[in-house]
């Protein structure tokens, strides 16, 4: 998992050297000022509603032109009756203490009936101080507006989206959270290398165990290794925490098998691959490594240069325990149950689900994600690649810069590659928001000061903790957390 964050940091560097200072919009003159954020929606003028929108500061830099920020401003321009006021805490990387203070302040406001009206969130966390660290528990506690009540008024058609992804934001059949983008687990490599090795994708597609058994067979027979960067327990059909049933599901055959495989592959396979290194791409084309096991947001960094070099890619979705595909939600949006303006909040959120926004990859993310709207796949990938490679601020780049980026990062994906991704996404049966293991659940700290769940998993993967000890230790702690 450490290599996953390293690769993500590489992707973020493509975007910009964004400042991470506080970007909280000024409050209304009539608003009380005990904190740096709007308490609730304030009326700007008699006919204007002000919605406070939580969005991390990195996305609100006017000079970078993130698609999500551009579309939010476009919404505001086309809706003169709605004014958006951004609530953007300081980055934890630049000032951890200040971020902790601001997040605590926001939590206090939310608990007391205030806080932002709208939340635009990314799943990936770079800090332990986050709003709604466990968004599913917050949904169970009815912290968010029931958006199903406003779907028809906003002409939202759920059938236009991947149902397995949408379901992650539902409670008792009602939509409280709108997933905006997601990622799927992929096995990627050079087609001629993998097909020529004797690897049988039909056998591997049966379920997660069958996939790794078939892959291990081929690796052993050919003396090869793969790059492994996954969290398998988050790619199961079954959740580790069943919020609706109030049950912890660590001690199941599927979880035990996934953790056993993860320990094997984490300690015996490669843990880093530079997707943007031309020499490593050429080595991958020659079979060293044999392939990459990555989430699609990282794997796309390899697929672009492979396509550009004319190297036919091999792409297979890594199945869950039941043979389907489990997605990871990358970004999502919701409105506060406390908002005074539910209709306006819903209109904004459903706008982000429209073809206009999904085609533009308008979601809070610093990597290439897949859109929830089915028909937006090709357009969104082209939009995201355009932004990530060119920084959307073309005036900042010289011709030499552009030539270098095009050579290094590749061009748009071939239609056949996009179609392969679409076919994999059509197999999605479930989706989860965040792995429990990293900066997600608040179970306290270990003796070394690390997150308890992260530390416990690492002790199992790299230390002497047995699988039984891991499960027996964490199950009661997680159950206590769930029951709080």
Question: Residue locations for each model-derived region?
Answer:
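Extracytoplasmic/periplasmic substrate-recognition and gating elements
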Residues: 88, 305-394
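Glycine-centered hinge/linker elements that transmit conformational signals in sensory
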Residues: 215, 219, 245-278, 303-318
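Conserved N-terminal structural module of periplasmic/extracytoplasmic solute-binding proteins
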Residues: 18-133, 455, 464-484
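C-terminal capping/gating helix-and-loop segments adjacent to ligand/active sites or protein-protein/ligand interfaces
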Residues: 64, 391-482
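Sec-dependent N-terminal signal peptides of Gram-positive bacterial secreted proteins and lipoproteins
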Residues: 4-24
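Extracytoplasmic/periplasmic solute-binding protein
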Residues: 167-189, 207-260, 286-293
């Amino acid at each position: 998992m450490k290599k996953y964050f390293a690769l993500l940091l590489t992707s973020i560097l493509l975007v910009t050297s964004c400042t991470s200072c506080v970007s909280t919009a000024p409050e209304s003159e009539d608003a009380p000022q005990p904190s740096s954020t709007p308490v609730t929606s304030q009326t700007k003028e008699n006919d204007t509603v002000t919605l406070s929108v939580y969005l991390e500061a990195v996305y609100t830099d006017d000079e970078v032109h993130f698609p999500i920020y551009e579309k939010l401003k476009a919404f505001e321009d086309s809706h003169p009756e709605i004014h958006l006021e951004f609530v953007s805490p300081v980055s934890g990387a630049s000032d951890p203490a200040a971020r902790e203070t601001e997040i605590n302040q926001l939590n206090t406001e939310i608990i007391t009936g205030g806080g932002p009206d709208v939340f635009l969130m990314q799943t990936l966390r770079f800090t332990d101080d986050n709003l709604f660290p466990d968004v599913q528990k917050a949904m169970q506690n009815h912290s968010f507006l029931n958006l199903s009540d406003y779907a028809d008024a906003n002409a939202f058609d759920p059938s236009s989206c991947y149902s397995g992804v949408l379901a992650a934001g539902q409670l008792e059949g009602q939509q409280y959270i709108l997933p905006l983008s997601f990622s799927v687990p992929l096995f990627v490599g050079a087609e001629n290398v993998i097909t020529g090795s004797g690897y049988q994708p039909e056998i591997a597609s049966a379920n997660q165990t069958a996939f790794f058994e078939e892959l291990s067979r081929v690796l052993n027979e050919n003396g090869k290794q793969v790059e492994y960067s996954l969290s398998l327990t988050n790619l199961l059909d079954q959740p580790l925490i069943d919020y609706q049933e109030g049950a912890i599901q660590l001690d199941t055959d599927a979880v035990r098998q996934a953790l056993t495989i993860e320990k094997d592959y984490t300690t015996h396979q490669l843990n880093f691959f530079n997707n943007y290194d031309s020499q490593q791409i050429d080595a991958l084309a020659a079979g060293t490594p044999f392939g990459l096991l990555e989430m699609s947001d990282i794997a796309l960094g390899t697929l672009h240069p492979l396509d550009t070099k004319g190297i036919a890619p091999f792409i297979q979705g890594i199945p869950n325990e039941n043979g389907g595909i489990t997605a990871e939600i990358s970004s999502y949006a919701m409105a506060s149950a406390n908002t005074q303006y539910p209709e306006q909040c819903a209109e904004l959120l459903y706008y982000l689900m429209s073809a206009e926004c999904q085609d533009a990859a308008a979601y809070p993310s610093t990597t290439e994600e897949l859109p929830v709207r089915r028909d937006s796949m090709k357009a969104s990938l082209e939009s995201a690649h355009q932004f990530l490679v060119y920084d959307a601020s073309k005036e900042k780049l010289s011709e030499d810069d552009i030539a270098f980026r095009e050579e290094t990062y590749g061009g748009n994906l071939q239609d056949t590659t996009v179609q392969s991704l679409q076919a994999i996404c059509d197999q999605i049966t479930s989706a989860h928001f965040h792995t429990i293991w990293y900066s997600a659940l608040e179970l306290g700290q270990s003796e070394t000061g690390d997150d308890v769940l992260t530390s416990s998993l690492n002790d199992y993967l790299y230390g002497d903790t047995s699988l039984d000890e891991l499960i027996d230790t964490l199950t009661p702690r997680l159950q206590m957390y769930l029951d709080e």
